[in-house]
Amino acid sequence: MKKFASVLVQLKTLALEKIEQKLESKRLELWQNEREILDKQAQLSAFKNPELGGMSLFLQIQQLKSALRMEIEYCQQEGEDLNKDLKILEKDYFLANQELEKAKIILENEKQKEKEILEKKEQALLDENAMILHWQKGGLHA
């Protein structure tokens, strides 16, 4: 049973590490997404409506601004999805951590049982040796 508990702890630890890697990856992806949103917002605010240049330049700038707004909306939606994924992963991490702690407790209990069994065996051997010595002493006096 101790071997099983030990393997269980190893598996739970690996599962936890895998979730940690996914969490780190999602956090990085979210950070990049937020950075992209800020860049696009900066680009959008850089566009000024031309006072000169006519209607065609005005329309081109409006189209660019519209395209940037759509990209920002897409990035923001992507950010919301990443946040949802992150929350799910954080919950998975919490549950995996709980499972790991349970597995560690099982392993500790098994180690304690094994220790108690060894102590009982040692005591039985000591008792047996004491009896043998007692019999030997009794045989010498007779």
Regions found by a protein language model. Name each.
Residues 1-142:
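Charge-rich amphipathic alpha-helical interaction elements
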